[in-house]
Curated annotation (Swiss-Prot):
The keyword 4Fe-4S does not apply. ATP binds at residue 596. Binds 1 zinc ion per subunit. Belongs to the class-I aminoacyl-tRNA synthetase family. IleS type 1 subfamily. This is Isoleucine--tRNA ligase. The gene is ileS. It comes from Lacticaseibacillus paracasei (strain ATCC 334 / BCRC 17002 / CCUG 31169 / CIP 107868 / KCTC 3260 / NRRL B-441) (Lactobacillus paracasei). NCBIfam families: ileS (TIGR00392).
Length: 928
């Protein structure tokens, strides 16, 4: 027998190296085969429901780091809630309609106009489903648990039917209307866009000042006076029918050479500098209200432009007189309608000037800027041309600029129930709190929602037209269409004639001959996803409406959060969510947006292959995702190191509780040593803190609290101290079993606490814990206990940890001075102040063991510390090399080695342990 055979060295098959890239897939396969998600749902039947509703990602392409951040965050919450007393089903979803899929098919050579609409839409459906399969694999590879076999998909028949019913509920209340209004128009995709489909990029635009000659100055201005406007869209000058001024502002007529001009008084100096007027002389000052209904000559066409009053005119830029084209601007439209101006669009669907822009027909609008500017110059109306770069709206899919263009569209009136939506926002809890203001302001300031789209791949608007062109939006017809969609899918709209889509025997006074046509436009995709609260939450029996939480990127304040709120309040009167948690974007290590063109993209698959999905999950738990998050390979390397520390500490506890049977070896709390009870109290604190942080969705605090406890409390202190007991004492020694009791309790609690973040690692530890549940994911979160001596222990041991820290400094200095090597070579004498002396009396533990030294003594109170002592605020410390020899079993420096003649190699403590437990060693001696 060798000396090491008498030690209780921890042994385990739990590997030091995680092998995450390989082993995670094995665990994920087991979860699927054993239906762990379904088992968890069954366990939670009858418990209160927590409903996190998944915002559907678009089914196009593999997932990126933003997807990973979002889906893992959701998974952490759902796993935690499921383990903490809630029934928390998670149904993933996908958004499948819209332009990107049409674009992908075009790239593959599919020609939409060379096939039937139903054949084309079938290709779109097939592409979407193939992308869903790809993304489902990606999400599951991240360890995300959910009902992956029964996701919700916006192209599902029942989903489309529910969406039609949401539309019907809005129509019934009078919120849907048909109108000619300027809307965001994407010439690159030939369709209207919602505000949520707009993104801003810098663009270079012309900046022109144009003079309109007064025709009727209402007795205030002569006809030799010019009204000066400023615009950055020369192509809209042919659509000009008016000039708008603010009734409250002061305006001036100024003489410049032999010309007279009118600008806002406050902007005169700036305009004069821009145009190059020298010494403009003010002739008159008057209010904007005095100019109301004056007229001026259009600089290009034989018609007049009307001067109008409106409050939207500001002094931020320009001249204080606003070029007004009712067909190409929202404010222009509002004031134009008020004054009875025509609403004319001078651009067609593809962005080319049309017949309403004589002289420029067939010219692309951006090219027309140059031609129109030249025409203005030729007429003597151009006062200044310049160029500047500014933030300009672009199509979020094609990345091309968009324009405002008046078209006849279907709208949802926000004004009709705006106050109701704003009141609903007050019922929602927002994290971060600024989200409430952001969403409130967006709803308060937004215009009506244009819900029609001129595309092929989407849910048709369930609207019919009578013989006289009257739209038919009736409860009976809408419900019938919803039933048809539920049975056959929305393709039925394109497969059948209008009469075959109407209820049998349907008649309408506007169609005396029984002839009907159907709407060709489809729904805005935001109406698709925005109807999920009814199509999914209210429709599926295992789910519930409203949701407890919507968790998405901060761009969804103008997207899914927004559209869902509008449709939900319209259809049901309440918000679809009780809480919103928003996240920032994932950027590269330099804070730049990730893009293929910059070559700075990092995809989850790459990180999974190098580090494992567990490292991505741990990274998600360490970042503050309420704002933008930087991502680099270095981040994951650092996270991998943090993971290694967590794993190694847990592995140590697994190894050193291998011979511990919790059923028979557990030591009651009251019988534990002081340091053991202190660690139980600390564990209790950790359980409370971690669960509080989970409840607040504060993953960073969860991770920091767990890691700090593992690394600082356990690895750097308790487990280090425990080695002298767990390794050295007899297997069933009460002190050893006491420390194993603490280790096992910590390991069990921490494994449960890390399961939502590190599920693969938790499952790897779980079999060693001998628990009744087959998987950690099926266990419940640990409950904090109540210990009567908690505050007393925390007070005592807080003082001891300060004391220990100072002794460690003294040991480090002794090591630097070559007095000792390891701390076990040290003999420590302390000269404490009275409070420290009292604390050491209260600790009630072997201080030498706690300091991991071979000798420790407290000098008598009357003894003066020697000059060579290390001085601290409340004590002095002397460190010497301990007298004696190193015991080969406990590694302490002892003066009593050989005192037992039967075991002359050992110190008296080790000899007594070996003699009592290993008689062969006494009889035969140790092998060399």
């Amino acid at each position: 027998m060798k000396i090491k055979d008498t030690l209780n060295m921890g042994k385990t098959s739990f590997p030091m190296r995680a092998g995450l890239p390989k082993n995670e897939s094995i665990w994920q396969k087991k979860w699927d085969e054993d239906h762990v998600y379904e088992q968890r749902q069954k366990l939670n039947e009858g418990k209160p429901t927590f409903m996190l509703h998944d915002g559907p990602p678009f089914a196009n392409g593999n997932i990126h780091m933003g997807h990973a951040l979002n889906k893992i965050s959701k998974d952490i919450i759902v796993r935690y809630k499921s383990m903490n007393g809630f029934r928390a089903p998670y149904v993933p979803g996908w958004d499948t309609h819209g332009l990107p899929i049409e674009q992908q098919l075009a790239k593959q050579g599919v020609k939409r106009k060379e096939m039937s609409m139903t054949d084309y839409r079938e290709l779109c459906r097939q592409f979407a489903m193939q992308e869903i399969d790809k993304q489902r694999t990606d999400f599951k590879r991240l360890g995300v648990m959910g009902d992956w076999e029964h996701p919700y998909i916006t192209l599902q028949h029942h989903y489309e039917a529910s969406e039609i019913r949401v539309f019907g509920a809005m129509a019934k209340k009078g919120y849907i209307y048909h109108g000619l209004k300027p809307v965001y128009w994407s010439w690159s995709s030939e369709s209207t866009l919602a505000e949520a489909e707009i993104e801003y990029h810098d663009d270079k635009s012309p900046s022109i000042y144009v003079a309109f000659k007064v025709v009727d100055g209402k007795g205030l201005l002569d006809t030799d006076t010019y009204l000066v406007i400023w615009t950055t869209t020369p192509w809209t000058i042919p659509a000009n029918y008016g000039i708008t001024v603010n009734p409250r502002f002061d305006y001036v007529q100024v003489q410049v050479g032999d010309k007279k001009y009118v600008v806002a008084a406050e902007l005169l100096d700036r305009v004069a500098e821009e145009i190059g007027w020298e010494n403009p002389k003010i002739l008159k000052t008057f209010k904007g209200t005095d100019m109301d209904k004056m007229t001026a000559q259009h600089p290009l066409y034989d018609r007049t432009s009307l001067v109008m009053n409106a409050d939207h005119v500001t002094l931020d830029a320009g001249t204080g007189l606003v070029h007004t084209a009712p067909g190409h601007g929202e404010d222009d439209y509002k004031v134009g309608v008020k004054y009875g101006l025509p609403v004319v669009s001078v651009v067609d669907a593809k962005g080319y000037m049309n017949e309403y822009a004589p002289g420029f027909e067939g010219v692309f609008y951006d090219d027309a800027n140059k031609q129109i500017t030249q025409a203005l110059a030729d007429k003597g109306a151009l006062l200044k041309l310049d160029f500047f770069t500014h933030s300009y709206p672009h199509d979020w899919r094609t990345k091309k600029p968009v324009i405002f263009r008046a078209t006849t569209q279907w709208f949802a009136s926000i004004d009709a129930f705006r106050d109701q939506i704003l009141k609903a926002i007050d019922t929602v809890d927002f994290k971060p709190s600024w989200g409430k203001t952001r969403l409130y302001n967006m709803i308060r300031d937004r215009g009506d929602w244009v819900i029609s789209r001129q595309r092929a791949w989407g849910v048709p608007l369930p609207i019919f037209y009578a013989e006289d062109g009257e739209p038919i939006i009736e409860e009976e017809t809408i419900n019938h269409v919803a039933d048809l969609f539920g049975k056959y899918g929305s393709n039925v709209w394109f497969e059948r004639e209008a009469k075959d889509l109407l209820p049998e025997g349907y008649t309408n006074p506007h169609s005396p001959n029984g002839q009907f046509t159907k709407e060709k436009d489809i729904m805005d995709v935001w109406f698709d996803s925005g109807s999920s609260h009814q199509a999914v939450l209210a429709a599926r029996p295992e789910l519930s409406f409203p949701a407890d939480l919507y968790l998405e990127g901060s761009d969804q304040y103008r997207g899914w959060f927004n559209s869902s709120l509008i449709t939900s309040v319209a259809a049901t009167g309440v918000a679809p969510y009780r809480g919103i948690l928003s996240q920032g974007f994932t950027l590269d290590g330099k804070g730049r947006k990730m893009s293929k063109s910059l070559g700075n993209t990092i995809v989850p698959a790459t990180i999974e292959k190098q580090f494992g999905a567990e490292i991505i999950r741990l990274w998600v738990a360490t970042v503050d995702s309420s704002s933008d998050v930087r991502v680099s390979v270095d981040n994951f390397a650092q996270t991998s190191e943090a993971y290694r520390k967590i794993r190694n500490t847990m592995r140590f506890m697994v190894a050193n509780t291998g011979d511990f049977d919790p059923e028979k070896d557990t030591v009651a709390y009251d019988e534990l040593g002081s340091v053991d009870r202190y660690m139980m109290v600390r564990l209790n604190q950790i359980i409370k803190q971690v669960k509080t942080a989970y409840d607040a969705y504060d993953f960073a605090t969860v991770e920091k609290t767990i890691s700090s406890f593992l690394v600082n409390d356990l690895s750097a202190f308790y487990l280090d101290v425990a080695k002298d007991v767990v390794y050295i004492e007899a297997k069933d020694d009460p002190k050893r079993r006491g420390m194993q009791t603490v280790m096992f309790a910590a390991l069990l609690a921490l494994t449960k606490l890390i399961t939502p973040i590190l599920p693969h690692t938790a499952e790897e530890v779980w079999p060693y814990l001998k628990q009744p549940e087959a998987y950690a994911a099926l266990a419940d979160m640990p409950e904090a206990e109540q210990f009567d001596d908690e505050s007393q222990l925390l007070d005592i041991w807080s003082g001891f940890m300060d004391f220990r820290s100072e002794v460690q400094k003294a040991l480090e200095l002794a090591r630097d001075n070559k007095v000792i090597g390891k701390s076990l070579e040290a003999a420590v004498t302390v000269y404490p102040s009275e409070p420290v002396r009292d604390m050491l009396d209260d600790v009630d533990a072997n201080v030498m063991q706690l300091l991991i030294t071979s000798h420790f003594e407290i000098a008598p109170a009357t003894t003066q510390a020697p000059a060579n002592a290390e001085q601290f605020d409340d004590m002095a410390v002397v460190v010497k090399h301990a007298d004696g020899e190193v015991c080969p079993r406990c590694r302490m420096v002892r003066t009593d080695i050989g005192t037992d003649p039967k075991l002359p190699q050992l110190c008296s403590r080790c000899a007594a342990i070996v003699e009592a437990n290993f008689p062969d060693a006494v009889t035969n001696g140790f092998d060399k």
